Amino acid sequence: MKTLTFISLMTTSVACLGSCTNPAASDAQQPWIVDRFDDIKVIRYEVPGFERLPLEQKELIYYLAEAAKCGRDILFDQNCAANLPIRRTLETLYLNYKGDRTSDEWKALEKYLKKVWFANGIHHHYSNDKFRPEFSESFFREAAASVGMDRFPADFDFLCKVIFDPAIYPTRLNQAAGADMLWTSASNYYSNVRQHEAEQFYAAMAAADAGDPCPVSYGLNSQLVKEEKTGRLYERTWKVGGMYSPAIERIVYWLEKARDVAAEPQKQTLAALIDYYRTGDLKQFDRYNILWLQDTVSNVDFVNGFIETYGDPLGYKASWEANVNFVDSAACRRTRIISENAQWFEDHSPVDPAYKKKVVKGVSAKVITVAMLGGDCYPATPIGINLPNADWIRKEHGSKSVTIDNITYAYDRAAHGNGFEEEFMLRPEDRERIDKYGKIGDDLHTDLHECLGHGSGQLAPGVKGDELKSYGSTLEETRADLFGLYYLGDPKLVELGLVPSFDVAKAQYASYILNGMMTQLARIEPGKNVEESHMRNRKLIAE
C-alpha cells in the first residue's frame, strides 16, 4: 500500500547532485514549482546525501535506477490499450511539427501531451476521466499531414476517434454500483472479459487452493483474456517470454547488473526477483517479498514489480512500479521508535480483539531519500509505502514501511507561502499551528499510516481479503488513515518524544479535514464522482 498526498508531483532529473547536501541551501536559488497546467504542479525534488554514499552504493543505485526507467511503457499499456500509440503519435508531432508553435491550437496540443505524460495515459490520474482536447480534430489531422502520415500508426483514424470522441474509453476505472466494472473501464487488465466471468475464474482458482495457508495473489501479474471464438479464458503472464517481454528483459538486464555489485542479503533478494520475472511464478514473488522485507540492514533499497492493485476494479491485477532509495539515517529516529513500540500500539488500538495480532512480527520502518521513481510511482509520487500486500506474509513475517523524506520536503517547500492558508483558514491560531507543526504532523501521520495502520491487525479466519472488490482499497486506506489519526492524539506520542504536544495532532486534523472536504475536490469536475482510492478514503473520513 502507498500513501498519496493531495499535491500531484512530477519528478525531474537531479541536475546537480553537488547542491543536494542541504536542501534548504537551494531554496532561494531555484523555484520548487517548475511548471503548472490544469490542476497539475510540476515540482522539483532533490536527492540530499547521494554524493556522500560509497562508490559501490552509487553504482548499485545507478543500475537499479536504470531498471526503474524500463517499465514506463508497461504502465501506459496497462492503463489503456490506446495509450502507447497515442503518446507516440503526439511525441512524433511534438518533435517534427514545423508550423506555428505560438498558436492557441498548438499550445493546447502541448498541454494535452503534458497531461498524457503526467497521467501515464489519456485519463486523469486521480479522477480517471478521459482528457478533453482543447485543440480541434481538423488541426490535429492537418498537423499530422504536414509532418507526413508515414510517420504515424496505420490506425491513425481510430486514434483520432479515441482522442476526440468522449464516448470511447470515457473512464479508466469505473467503480459505479451496478455497472460491469470491467466492460466499462478503459484499463487493459482484461481483454473481452465480463466482470462475472473474471470473478468466477479467480474464485475457482481460490477454491482449488482453499487449504493453502500461503495462497498466491491470484492474477496479480497477468492480463485475463477471453478468446472470441471459443470463449476460453486464459492469462497472459507478464514475464520474460510472455506479455511485456521486451520491457521486462531490459528490467532484468539492469537487475542482474545490480545483483552482481550488491552485497548479501540483497544479492539473494535480487536473484529471487530476477527468477520471478523470468518465470512469472507467483510463489517466487512471495519468496522475493519475504527476503525483501527481512532485509533491514541494506542502506540502499528498492521496489520493482507489479505491486499495487488500485487500478483494477476487482483488485486482482497490479500496476508496474519502481522506487530506488537509500536510508536517511538522521530522520529515522521517529520510525525506529514507532516500530519498536508496534506491539503497544496494536494492543491499545480501538479494535475488536479478534482482529488484533497477538504477537506483532517483523515490523520495520525507516525514512528514506528516493533517488529514482518509475511506473506507477512516477510522476504522481507516493510519500509513504508499506509492503508486501499479501496478508499471510504480513501476518507471519511482518512488513516494511518507509516515509519518503525528500519528497515530503519538496511538497512542503512548494506549498510554503502560496497564500493557501490565508485564503482557506480563517483563524490565525490555526494558520500559526499548521505553519509550526504541519510538516511534522504530515510526516508522523504517514509513518503511523504505513507502519502501524497497514501493518496492524489480522483478517478473520477464512477471509482472503479480496471480498470487498472495488471497495477494498478505499476501506484499507481508510483503516490505515484512521489508525494514524487516532494515535496522533494519544499521550503516548508525547511520552515517546515523538511530538511536543497535542498541537501537532490539532494541526494535522485541521489540514486533513480541509483536504478531505474541499482541497482535493479541485481535481474533480463538478458532477463527477471521486474515484481514486486515497481521495475516497479522505472524503469518507472528513465528511
Locations of regions flagged by a protein language model:
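C-terminal motif of bacterial Sec signal peptides marking the signal peptidase cleavage site
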Residues: 15-19
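Short alpha-helix carrying the canonical HExxH Zn2+-binding catalytic motif
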Residues: 439-452
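Long, well-structured alpha-helical subdomains associated
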Residues: 46, 75, 485-543
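An active-site-proximal "capping" alpha-helix that borders the catalytic cofactor pocket
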Residues: 54, 263-264, 473-490
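Catalytic Zn2+-binding segment of zinc metalloproteases
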Residues: 451-463, 487, 491
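Contiguous, non-catalytic segments that form substrate-binding/exosite surfaces or channel walls
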Residues: 113-432, 438
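N-terminal-proximal low-complexity accessory segments that begin disordered
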Residues: 27-89
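Post-HEXXH active-site segment of zinc metalloproteases
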Residues: 457-478
